[in-house]
């Protein structure tokens, strides 16, 4: 059997994640300031749902009456946490590997626009590079997702949609878990005109359940494997207009975090390399919450799901409560 390195979960309940704060132009805004945050950290799994735009539905979001000012051409940081009260050492379960992405949509009123429908364009993506996933980079960075705001887009109000996709159960259709929230921002210092990227996209509509970046067995991948990031190509400013030429393809990925970009280094617990399946053991009557891991190769946490959920096998490496 192929030797596998299995990341140990710190807690069965620490699986999910929320975009809770935005840092812009040196200011870290309070939790939920200018962001439509939910009280529950569950995923969206139906890529045809309107909830794919800015979350909601199974994870009801709370409106915010704040808009955050962001300079065109600057780098902002979407700050991710397991819950609204978690710290930098509790971002997302390390087993939840996948890409990170960010999109912008120009709107008339960032406070009231639902985000549903057209007008979206991708401005950030980090997929898989030499064995490193975008989500792992965010965890290593203490929850920071670095997002460059294009310098060439018009000033005005936008929705900034930050997203992390977990692929641990994505070997079957609708197994990918998508996490996203929308920040309400006002971009200043942009171009004086009204031109936007020539092509924009609709959410829902940017993904299909059968996209190779959403229907994939990550456990069969090697460090040299190629991964196709979901969604359209990333927008970049034309040469001589605040950025590099053209729009990048989505089959290449951003480099993993380096010591110069890490805000905080968080060491992930790693189990000993295993060459055989270890049967999970009961853990004193504990129960796992909805969407939490409850089984899989090398797993030794809670194997009983809280009522009314049951433990369902997604693949040999991951079972979850649903």
Swiss-Prot record:
Biotechnological exploitation: Lignocellulose is the most abundant polymeric composite on Earth and is a recalcitrant but promising renewable substrate for industrial biotechnology applications. Together with cellobiose dehydrogenases (CDHs) an enzymatic system capable of oxidative cellulose cleavage is formed, which increases the efficiency of cellulases and put LPMOs at focus of biofuel research.
Per the entry, what this protein does is:
Lytic polysaccharide monooxygenase (LPMO) that depolymerizes crystalline and amorphous polysaccharides via the oxidation of scissile alpha- or beta-(1-4)-glycosidic bonds, yielding C4 oxidation products. Catalysis by LPMOs requires the reduction of the active-site copper from Cu(II) to Cu(I) by a reducing agent and H(2)O(2) or O(2) as a cosubstrate. Active on tamarind xyloglucan and konjac glucomannan.
Keywords recorded for this protein, A-Z: Carbohydrate metabolism, Cellulose degradation, Copper, Disulfide bond, Glycoprotein, Metal-binding, Monooxygenase, Oxidoreductase, Polysaccharide degradation, Secreted, Signal
Enumerate the cofactors the protein uses. Answer: Cu(2+)
Q: Which organism is it from?
A: Neurospora crassa (strain ATCC 24698 / 74-OR23-1A / CBS 708.71 / DSM 1257 / FGSC 987)
The cofactor note from the UniProt entry for this protein is: Binds 1 copper ion per subunit.
According to UniProt, the name of this protein is: AA9 family lytic polysaccharide monooxygenase A
Q: Which reaction does this chain catalyze?
A: [(1->4)-beta-D-glucosyl]n+m + reduced acceptor + O2 = 4-dehydro-beta-D-glucosyl-[(1->4)-beta-D-glucosyl]n-1 + [(1->4)-beta-D-glucosyl]m + acceptor + H2O
Q: Which PANTHER family match?
A: ENDOGLUCANASE II (PTHR33353:SF18), PUTATIVE (AFU_ORTHOLOGUE AFUA_1G12560)-RELATED (PTHR33353)
Q: Where is it located? A: Secreted
């Amino acid at each position: 059997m192929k030797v596998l390195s299995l990341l140990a979960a710190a807690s069965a309940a620490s699986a999910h994640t929320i975009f809770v704060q935005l840092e812009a132009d040196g200011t870290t805004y309070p939790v939920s300031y200018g962001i439509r945050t939910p009280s529950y950290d569950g995923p969206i799994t139906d890529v045809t749902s309107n909830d794919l735009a800015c979350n909601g539905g199974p994870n009801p979001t709370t409106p915010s009456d704040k808009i955050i000012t962001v300079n065109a051409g600057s780098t902002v940081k979407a700050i991710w946490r397991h819950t609204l009260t978690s710290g930098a050492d509790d971002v997302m379960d390390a087993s939840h590997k996948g890409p990170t992405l960010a999109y912008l949509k120009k709107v008339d009123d960032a406070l009231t626009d639902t985000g549903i429908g057209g007008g979206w364009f991708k401005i950030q993506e980090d997929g898989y590079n030499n064995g490193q996933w975008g989500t792992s980079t965010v965890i290593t960075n203490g929850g920071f997702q670095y997002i460059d705001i294009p310098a060439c887009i018009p000033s005005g109000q936008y929705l900034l949609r930050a997203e992390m996709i977990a692929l641990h159960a994505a070997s079957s259709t609708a197994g990918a878990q998508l996490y996203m929230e929308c920040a309400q921002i006002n971009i200043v210092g942009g171009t004086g005109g009204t031109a936007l990227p020539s092509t924009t996209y609709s959410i829902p509509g940017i993904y299909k359940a059968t996209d190779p970046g959403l229907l994939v067995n990550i456990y069969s991948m090697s460090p040299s494997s190629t991964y196709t990031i979901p969604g359209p190509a990333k927008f970049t400013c034309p040469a001589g207009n605040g950025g590099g030429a053209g729009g990048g393809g989505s089959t290449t990925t951003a480099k993993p975090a380096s010591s110069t970009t890490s805000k905080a280094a968080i060491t992930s617990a790693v189990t000993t390399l295993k060459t055989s399946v270890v049967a999970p053991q009961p853990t004193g009557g504990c129960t796992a919450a909805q969407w939490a891991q409850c089984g899989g190769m090398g797993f030794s946490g809670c194997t009983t799901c809280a009522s009314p959920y049951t433990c369902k096998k997604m693949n040999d490496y991951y079972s979850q409560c649903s």
